[in-house]
């Protein structure tokens, strides 16, 4: 995507009237490599001008915000480093196809003896771009078609239309994205969408039509998102054999909710990390901004990763959540938590743990799940340093529970109920990392603590997705 170029690495004199008259004699000055490196690192320079070649519809103010640190560089090494950082910021805006950097001595009447010019050669994206790709969700694959209008108003705004057709879900949506100049992490977006999903474990079909507005911003080492969402939900039965409990949930509802999400992520990879930690906390309040659905919902996700000897990695994760209905109306099957499957408690079928009626799983209002994992290289290290590095041997122990609580009881009763009838499983398998997109797991699972009504997958189980317990 481009490189940083320096026209000359010869030492730059800091003063002297003969700077412009050295002529060709400078080509014959020999400098020892060690001394030359020392001079480059310590030589004081001044960035006098920053030029842009290739700008069209991009506004100057957003560019100035991204390259301002280049002027603060005090030596050539700093100039190269800050120019590279500025290049990465420009690419992150998503409005350039390519960005190259050229560093040269300053030219012109106002040139200082130690002055430098930095030139960014950019290629803007076309006004309309299209894309076609496949995407892997949690045990679901989909085909995605997209149209994008990048840099719509010249300040990195983006309008995107996306259509997705998957094995269980079909959706299309229109979104507008606007970053804050000079601080890409602070951004605002508006979305219009329609999503139709099938949930065979509940014999349920759900169609959502809605809109949302969200604002994302960082605070210290945390990322926050504040969101409002209004959605018209239509629930129906997926088959004639759906239970009465599911049929009773069928119909229309309107949900208007405010939510907040906080993320702290120090992992080196989101797909198969070797080190670092993750903490996600989500809160949602529905009903106070309209609609006929009212509840408070809290859930969190914690993950710790530690690299061990022999290139092994130990990972521990813990999930939990609680849904409290507000008023006399019970919670909806569309808002409850679900547990079980190759991406959560392995050895059980997808979302097939907890309350159920006539074989249809209804979800629960409280849950917890934990996992311990050991990832090691493949035995005898086939393909070491190449394709074989994408595979890892996987040993795991999972446990958890999903239930409904009587909120008239105290916290001790809630904890006691969550500690009853714990489902757990153990096993081993192979993990394949698909770049930074998704991961595949093929495990041999032994489910334990099975309760009446649970649906198990005893033996080989395949999982694909981006979020795993």
Curated annotation (Swiss-Prot):
The modification N6-methyllysine is found at residue 255. Residues 45-125 form the POTRA domain. Belongs to the SAM50/omp85 family. One of its GO terms (biological process) is mitochondrial respiratory chain complex assembly. It is found in: Mitochondrion outer membrane; Cytoplasm; Mitochondrion. It holds the Pfam family Omp85. Its C-terminal part seems to contain many membrane-spanning sided beta-sheets, that have the potential to adopt a transmembrane beta-barrel type structure. One of its GO terms (cellular component) is membrane. Plays a crucial role in the maintenance of the structure of mitochondrial cristae and the proper assembly of the mitochondrial respiratory chain complexes. Required for the assembly of TOMM40 into the TOM complex. Associates with the mitochondrial contact site and cristae organizing system (MICOS) complex, composed of at least MICOS10/MIC10, CHCHD3/MIC19, CHCHD6/MIC25, APOOL/MIC27, IMMT/MIC60, APOO/MIC23/MIC26 and QIL1/MIC13. This complex was also known under the names MINOS or MitOS complex. The MICOS complex associates with mitochondrial outer membrane proteins SAMM50, MTX1 and MTX2 (together described as components of the mitochondrial outer membrane sorting assembly machinery (SAM) complex) and DNAJC11, mitochondrial inner membrane protein TMEM11 and with HSPA9. Its main location: mitochondrion. Residues 1-20 are annotated as: Disordered. It is a multi-pass membrane protein. The lineage of its organism: Eukaryota, Metazoa, Chordata, Craniata, Vertebrata. This is Sorting and assembly machinery component 50 homolog. Keywords: Cytoplasm, Membrane, Methylation, Mitochondrion, Mitochondrion outer membrane, Transmembrane, Transmembrane beta strand. InterPro entries: Bac_surfAg_D15, D15-like, POTRA. It comes from Homo sapiens. The keyword Transmembrane helix does not apply.
